[in-house]
């Protein structure tokens, strides 16, 4: 930690199904003293029912501490090739008939796409959907991405998505993050499922209703509106891997610090869903000494980068 945080949090979140798989190059049943600490390793969690969203989370030893020379590369290449071969044998489940995202639609008067990245639109993220030989990996470390590209394992038709660089933000939440008050005229709430079409219309990354309903969320609503017309003006979720995701503030309400308020609200009140499964190592009271949050932000998404600082 925190290099492997995405994989770690995804496993902590649970919501496993018969099609979930955990692949490891390390025999986790063998005693630690029987393993060579210098041998590279790779671990992956696979859930292909998540299509077209992230289906695979991985972590590898060389991501945390990359060796100075290239002597480790042949072993790493073999581990990656072996992992991909195993993943390729995991069949994706038939698409559910409800909560589809191929045509997410939009409420009247809304633009068709609101882009988190200036260079990628929703169609790019859906290109792989009809080809189950392609799986979407999430939060891939640059060292592992280089190996995947060198081995020719990245779909060339998905280059717009696959080669889009992201910056990883790690948030140390040990100092008791607290929620901050909103400006007058706004209140916190949760994202109501009836507003999922609105949420999905504001992001180019495909989202499924069946995923959103599982996730911790926070929304900001204006006060003084009738209950029949009430809809959020800002929202955010914690993803399956606890990353800050689908963060959005409507244009008319930007510049008020609402994005950071949403982030603090989620981190202060909803991270325990993941932390409750932390190993109980720490001080004499059994307190866990690890309290990290994280977010992946496209390098051309300047507004979200400001939120992470």
Which residues fall in each region the model found?
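A conserved short alpha-helix in the GNAT/GCN5 acetyltransferase fold that borders
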Residues: 84, 254, 263-271
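Short amphipathic alpha-helix that is part of the acyltransferase structural core
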Residues: 1-4, 8, 173-209
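Conserved active-site alpha-helix within GNAT-family acetyltransferase domains
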Residues: 142-156, 274-309
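A conserved beta-strand-loop-helix scaffold within acyl/acetyltransferase catalytic domains
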Residues: 205-252
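Conserved glycine-rich acetyl-CoA-binding loop
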Residues: 68, 246-261, 273, 302
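Alpha-helix termini
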Residues: 90-98, 120-125, 223-228, 269-288
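Glycine-rich, flexible loop segments associated with nucleotide phosphate handling
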Residues: 126-132, 186-188, 228-233, 267, ...
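Acyl-donor-binding surface of acyltransferase catalytic domains
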Residues: 3-184
């Amino acid at each position: 930690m925190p290099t492997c945080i995405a994989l770690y949090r995804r496993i902590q979140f649970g919501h496993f199904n018969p099609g979930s798989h955990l692949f490891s190059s390390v025999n986790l049943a063998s005693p630690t003293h029987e393993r060579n600490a210098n041998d590279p390793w790779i671990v992956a969690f696979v859930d292909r029912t998540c299509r077209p969203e992230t289906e695979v989370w991985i972590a590898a030893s060389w991501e945390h501490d990359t060796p100075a020379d290239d002597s480790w590369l042949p072993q790493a290449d073999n581990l990656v090739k072996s992992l991909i071969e195993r993943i390729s044998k995991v069949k994706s489940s038939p698409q559910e008939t409800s909560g589809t995202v191929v045509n997410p639609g939009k409420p009247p008067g809304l633009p068709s796409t609101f882009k988190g990245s200036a260079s990628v639109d929703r169609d790019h993220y859906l290109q792989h959907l009809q080809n189950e030989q392609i799986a979407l990996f999430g939060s891939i470390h640059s060292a592992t991405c280089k190996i995947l590209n060198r081995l020719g394992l990245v779909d060339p038709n998905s280059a717009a998505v696959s080669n889009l660089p992201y910056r990883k933000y790690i948030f140390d939440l040990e100092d008791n993050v607290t929620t901050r008050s909103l400006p007058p005229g706004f209140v916190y709430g949760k994202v109501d499922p009836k507003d999922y079409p609105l949420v999905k219309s504001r992001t180019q990354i495909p989202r499924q209703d069946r995923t959103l309903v599982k996730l911790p969320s926070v929304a900001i609503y204006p006060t003084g509106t009738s209950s029949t017309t009430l809809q959020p003006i800002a929202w955010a979720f914690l993803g399956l891997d606890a990353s800050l995701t689908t963060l959005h503030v409507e244009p008319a309400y930007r510049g008020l610090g609402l994005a950071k308020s949403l982030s603090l609200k989620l981190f202060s009140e909803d991270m325990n869903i993941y932390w409750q499964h932390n190993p109980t190592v720490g001080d004499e009271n059994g307190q866990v000494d690890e309290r990290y949050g994280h977010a992946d932000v496209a390098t051309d998404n300047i507004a979200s980068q400001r939120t992470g600082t």
